[in-house]
């Protein structure tokens, strides 16, 4: 037993135990951490004063409840972007600040920063990790850089060309369903429901060369993909379920675990089968067989990819990238197509001009087949797609965590450790960037009108090193499907105005309903 004596404080020697010493050490450590955090917090508050701040609800809630994933919340967000057009600070409660950037000049420093300086913030997308693994969406550092380089050939134009046939087939299956429904008197359809199923059908063929006929009959795999997306979205809205140990004890957590296992088993089975086929045939014979079918699918490209050192991707890596493509490719494209149909339904003059452009292009040709070279011959349709993506970007926000101080062009500094929100919808609705931003005007994207505009004024697929690797795939699919839809149907507004709803992507509450009228297709 040691004696603790502090005579200079007038205290008598007292006996001390190891527990008391441990308590003193732990207490001192906690006090030091609290003081360090307090200093850093107030230092950041001081440094953030250069960013304006919208009025809070109160000191405790901060701006919580003002920016919500609802129509009202999105309106509040775009209003803030209009008022504070160079960016602003919002507080999630009393101690968590975010910097919201909503102008091309201010987002440039973040989007152009390396993935090491401004990596993705994993606050919510970490819920996807048990499903998507260390794919390109969730990985970071050297692994992300290596995978990004190895995946780039999978989205080369020569590969994308072969997917056009798949886009045509999947779109025509959906349009035949619509013809059948219209003949039975059902002219009011939820665009999200039908188009999501069509994009999943296309992706399953492009990634796995597998046709589940999911648009014609139920598919367990496709139903599981939809279930996983819904469970991730539901989890993000319940604070207690953010803790893994609580979530996986819940009914939803067990459902999520089972669904992940089913999806992984499907992907693993495809990879194993290809691994068996490849060494048996040899690479040359493998390519010859693929040339006959005119399709080199995503799994094929990943199996054949090698990095600078000649190393291939592991089966686990291939599964992660295939599952990531399946997740990232269906909802975003479905959102983009659904909203462009909504905008064209509200502007029949633009819809008719797009239709005439497609009719002229396909004159004396098969009205159910769009070819790769046709995509460059649809300038007005492309302008309409881009203007819809401006008004209704599928992913309205992207978050980045600053690992070091980042200096903006105007001299303001975003402190290290602060999370930045790249407000894509704010940039797209910023009146200092886009005059009359709420008006749907495809002519904004006329080449003459685009001269001098910042490339960061329009970023539906993000920008910089971590932009969407599949954007060419998405644009090609949207243009093919939209051309075929406009050729065979007229789209009219529903009697109810949709209310935007932000989930994993931009949706509409209760679905996005439009009325469809079959057209008599004659291109002679």
From Swiss-Prot:
GO terms for biological process: arachidonate metabolic process; epoxygenase P450 pathway; fatty acid metabolic process; leukotriene B4 catabolic process; long-chain fatty acid metabolic process; menaquinone catabolic process; phylloquinone catabolic process; pressure natriuresis. Pfam families: p450. GO terms for cellular component: apical plasma membrane; cytoplasm; endoplasmic reticulum membrane; intracellular membrane-bounded organelle. The gene is CYP4F12. Belongs to the cytochrome P450 family. It is an enzyme of class 1 (oxidoreductase). The keyword Protease does not apply. Its cofactor is heme. It catalyses: an organic molecule + reduced [NADPH--hemoprotein reductase] + O2 = an alcohol + oxidized [NADPH--hemoprotein reductase] + H2O + H(+); (5Z,8Z,11Z,14Z)-eicosatetraenoate + reduced [NADPH--hemoprotein reductase] + O2 = 18-hydroxy-(5Z,8Z,11Z,14Z)-eicosatetraenoate + oxidized [NADPH--hemoprotein reductase] + H2O + H(+); (7Z,10Z,13Z,16Z,19Z)-docosapentaenoate + reduced [NADPH--hemoprotein reductase] + O2 = 10,11-epoxy-(7Z,13Z,16Z,19Z)-docosatetraenoate + oxidized [NADPH--hemoprotein reductase] + H2O + H(+); (7Z,10Z,13Z,16Z,19Z)-docosapentaenoate + reduced [NADPH--hemoprotein reductase] + O2 = 13,14-epoxy-(7Z,10Z,16Z,19Z)-docosatetraenoate + oxidized [NADPH--hemoprotein reductase] + H2O + H(+). GO terms for molecular function: alkane 1-monooxygenase activity; arachidonate epoxygenase activity; heme binding; iron ion binding; leukotriene-B4 20-monooxygenase activity; monooxygenase activity. Its EC number is 1.14.14.1. The chain crosses the membrane at residues 19-39, 87-107. Expressed in small intestine, liver, colon and heart. Pathway: Lipid metabolism; arachidonate metabolism. It is found in: Endoplasmic reticulum membrane; Microsome membrane. Keywords: Endoplasmic reticulum, Fatty acid metabolism, Heme, Iron, Lipid metabolism, Membrane, Metal-binding, Microsome, Monooxygenase, Oxidoreductase, Transmembrane, Transmembrane helix. This is Cytochrome P450 4F12. Heme binds at residue 468. A cytochrome P450 monooxygenase involved in the metabolism of endogenous polyunsaturated fatty acids (PUFAs). Mechanistically, uses molecular oxygen inserting one oxygen atom into a substrate, and reducing the second into a water molecule, with two electrons provided by NADPH via cytochrome P450 reductase (CPR; NADPH-ferrihemoprotein reductase). Catalyzes the hydroxylation of carbon hydrogen bonds, with preference for omega-2 position. Metabolizes (5Z,8Z,11Z,14Z)-eicosatetraenoic acid (arachidonate) toward 18-hydroxy arachidonate.
């Amino acid at each position: 037993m040691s004696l603790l004596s502090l005579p200079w404080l007038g205290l008598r020697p007292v006996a001390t135990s190891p527990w008391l010493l441990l308590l003193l050490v732990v207490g001192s450590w906690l006090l030091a951490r609290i003081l360090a955090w307090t200093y850093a917090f107030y230092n950041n508050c001081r440094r953030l004063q250069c960013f304006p701040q919208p009025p809070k609800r109160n000191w405790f809630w901060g701006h919580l409840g003002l920016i919500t994933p609802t129509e009202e919340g999105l309106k509040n967000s775009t209003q803030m972007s209009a008022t504070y057009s160079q960016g602003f600070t919002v507080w999630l409660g009393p101690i968590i600040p975010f910097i919201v950037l909503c102008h091309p000049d201010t987002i440039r420093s973040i989007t152009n920063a390396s993935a090491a300086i401004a990596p993705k913030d994993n606050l919510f997308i970490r819920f996807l990790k048990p499903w998507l693994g260390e794919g390109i969406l969730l990985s970071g550092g050297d692994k992300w850089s290596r995978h990004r380089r190895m995946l780039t050939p999978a989205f080369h134009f020569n590969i994308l060309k072969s997917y056009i046939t798949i886009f045509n087939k999947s779109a025509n299956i959906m349009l035949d369903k619509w013809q059948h429904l219209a003949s039975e008197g059902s002219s009011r359809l939820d665009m999200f429901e039908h188009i999501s199923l069509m994009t999943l059908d296309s992706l399953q063929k492009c990634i796995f060369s597998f046709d589940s006929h999911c648009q014609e009959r139920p598919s367990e795999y496709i139903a599981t993909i939809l279930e996983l997306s819904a469970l991730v979205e539901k989890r993000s809205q319940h604070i207690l379920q953010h803790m893994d140990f609580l979530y996986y004890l819940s009914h939803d957590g067990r459902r999520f675990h089972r669904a992940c296992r089913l999806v992984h088993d499907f992907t693993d089975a495809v990879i194993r089968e290809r691994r068996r086929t490849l060494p048996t045939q040899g690479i040359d014979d493998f390519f010859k067989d693929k040339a006959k079918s005119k399709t080199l699918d995503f799994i094929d490209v990943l199996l054949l990819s090698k990095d600078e050192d000649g190393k291939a991707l592991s089966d686990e890596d291939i599964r992660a990238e295939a599952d990531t493509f399946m997740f990232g490719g269906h909802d975003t494209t479905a959102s983009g197509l659904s909203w462009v149909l909504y905008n064209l339904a509200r502007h029949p003059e633009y819809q008719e001009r797009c239709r005439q452009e497609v009719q002229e292009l396909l004159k004396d040709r098969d009205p159910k087949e769009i070819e790769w070279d046709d995509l460059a011959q649809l300038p007005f349709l492309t302008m309409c797609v881009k203007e819809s993506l401006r008004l209704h970007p599928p992913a309205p926000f992207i978050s980045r965590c600053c690992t070091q101080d980042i200096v903006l062009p105007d001299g303001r500094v975003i402190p290290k450790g602060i999370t930045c929100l790249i407000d894509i919808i704010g940039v797209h609705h910023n009146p200092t960037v886009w005059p009359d931003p709420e008006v749907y005007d495809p002519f904004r994207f006329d080449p003459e009108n685009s001269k001098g505009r910042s490339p960061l004024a329009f970023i539906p697929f993000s920008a910089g090193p971590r932009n969407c690797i599949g954007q060419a795939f998405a644009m090609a699919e949207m243009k093919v499907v939209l051309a075929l839809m406009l050729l065979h149907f007229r789209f009219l507004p529903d009697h109810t105005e949709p209310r935007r709803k932000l989930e994993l992507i931009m949706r509409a509450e209760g679905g996005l309903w439009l009325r469809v009228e079959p057209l008599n297709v004659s291109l002679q």
